[in-house]
Swiss-Prot record:
It comes from Vibrio vulnificus (strain CMCP6). ATP binds at L183, I184, K265, G287, Q296. Belongs to the ThiI family. Its main location: cytoplasm. Residues 404-482 form the Rhodanese domain. This is tRNA sulfurtransferase.
Length: 482
């Protein structure tokens, strides 16, 4: 098993020193993730590309998933690599691998070459293509729009026969840009905006303003953990939770109805700015889009921005909602967002779309800012990798089992893609598949006289979901950890 990783082209327009630094960071990121998830997989930096190889196909799917979801990679080539003696040896190797593919088909050979050789790329294409045409009678050469394109690369003394192309994520390697703090709510917008900055090379930390209790926080942690685990697990990332209910209560009591929405957003930004300052983070990220709600008009956004000296980034500012949802679907956060509880304790009957500075300041003069400072001081921060540990500590009554008791049902709560890649089958045991994001709505329809053992690959999601179900009054759930 061998993959050739092509870095994003923007990296190569940088200066030599920056290019080397970026590719070195990319190599390190790939190595960290692969070492955490697989065994005996080697990573090598070859200046203009990175090679990832192993002696077996045991971790093929895991490695391919890692490479196609790691920022900074333009494409991933799956190759068969070998040495060669001369042109004829190359032809014979290509014939052995491609004979069956081109039978009764039209084909063309496309070659790239780098290094010192006694032949050109065009001569290589002609020699190999002509040989294949003579050796496979049912095949014929067609230079434009053929059925099969045989792609080969000769690099110094190595022949790479390209078996498949896989599109990479693009962007810059994680850690090449400065850290950001994302104001995450778990909905469509904040998940996509966080992803876009991860893709661009920033370590994105997460700040959650809790307005809806533990169930909402569990859901948001799932989204943040998913984004980190899938796209940025080479980095150490913080998750900060701020209990904002006291702030909301103060706004409801002290602020005039029409100004509540903008004042709440200003409080969010003040608090996020304090958190960012504590961790020396220069910019905040939000999922706001222009005109989406009353607090997101240009006038109101300007009044919101002035309360902090941190740069506020809004990557979705001109996006339509359907565009945002499409990206959420592509990156895997749509199902989280669809089932995320929407909490907002500040709902104005007639929210202002064009706030006035003097009126906002007059309303905020009634607000007790000691409350805001207190909730920020009491904010809970954790390493995002410790979400599994926290869920276990928060719910010690959630039992974990290795053996399956009689009549128990195993609930495979992995996503459909994960379940398809590695179906869970246990002899003599009933296994049901309900994705984690449907548990909240479908678990109550199950036979509650039975015990259900929740299963996921790493035990993180199963613990969080077990905690959530127990909070909803279901005591017939355990975590299955074979």
């Amino acid at each position: 098993m061998k993959f050739i990783v092509k870095p994003h082209p923007e990296i190569f327009v940088k200066s030599e020193s920056v290019r080397k630094r970026f590719t070195k960071i990319l190599e390190s990121n790939i190595r960290i993730i692969i070492q955490n998830r697989t065994e005996s997989v080697a990573v090598f930096n070859r200046r203009d590309h990175i090679e990832v190889s192993a002696n077996s196909h045991q971790y093929y799917q895991q490695v391919l998933e890692i490479l196609t979801t790691t920022p900074g990679i333009q494409q991933v080539l799956e190759v068969k690599q070998s040495g060669f003696k001369d042109l004829h040896d190359i032809y014979e190797q290509v014939l052995e691998l491609s004979r069956e593919r081109i039978e009764n088909k039209t084909f063309v050979v496309r070659a790239k070459r780098r290094g010192k050789h006694d032949f050109t790329s065009i001569e290589l294409e002609r020699y190999v293509g002509g040989g294949l045409n003579q050796s496979v009678e049912s095949a014929s050469v067609k230079l434009h729009n053929p059925d099969i394109t045989i792609k080969i690369e000769v690099v110094d003394d190595k022949l790479n026969q390209i078996l498949a192309h896989h599109k990479g994520l693009g962007g810059f390697p994680l850690g090449t840009q400065e850290d950001l703090l994302s104001l995450i709510s778990g909905g469509f917008d904040s998940g996509v905006s966080s992803y876009l900055h991860i893709k661009r090379g920033s370590k994105v930390h997460y700040c959650f303003f809790n307005l809806g209790g533990p169930a909402h926080e569990i859901g948001v942690k799932q989204v943040a953990h998913f984004l980190w685990n899938k796209y940025g697990s080479s980095a150490k990332v913080r998750f900060i939770s701020v209990d904002f209910e006291p702030v909301v209560a103060e706004i409801l009591e002290k602020v005039e109805d029409g100004q509540m929405g903008v004042v709440l957003k200003r409080m969010f930004m003040r608090a996020a700015g304090m958190v960012a300052e504590k961790f020396d983070i220069q910019a905040l990220v939000t999922g706001e889009a222009l005109g989406q709600v009353s607090s997101q008009t240009l006038t109101n956004l300007r009044h919101i921005d002035v309360v902090t000296d941190r740069l506020i980034l809004r990557p979705l500012i001109n996006w339509d909602k359907d565009e945002i949802i499409k990206v959420a679907r592509d990156i895997g956060t749509e199902d989280f967002a669809k089932t995320m509880p929407e909490y907002c304790g500040v709902i104005s009957k007639k929210p202002t779309v064009k706030a006035v500075k003097e009126k906002l300041e007059a309303e905020e003069a009634n607000f007790n800012f000691d409350i805001l400072e207190q909730v920020v001081r009491n904010a809970r921060q954790m390493d995002i990798r410790d979400i599994a540990k926290e869920s276990a500590q928060a719910a010690p009554e959630v039992e974990q089992v290795q053996a399956i008791e009689e009549h128990a049902v195993v609930l495979d709560i992995r996503s459909p893609d994960e379940e398809d890649d590695s179906p869970l089958e246990i002899d003599g045991v009933e296994v049901k598949h309900i994705p984690f994001y449907k548990l909240s709505t479908q678990f109550g329809d199950l036979d509650q006289s039975k015990t259900y053992l929740l299963y996921c690959a790493r035990g993180v999601m199963s613990r969080l979901q077990a905690l959530y179900l127990q909070e909803q009054g279901f005591n017939n759930v355990k975590v299955y950890r074979p």
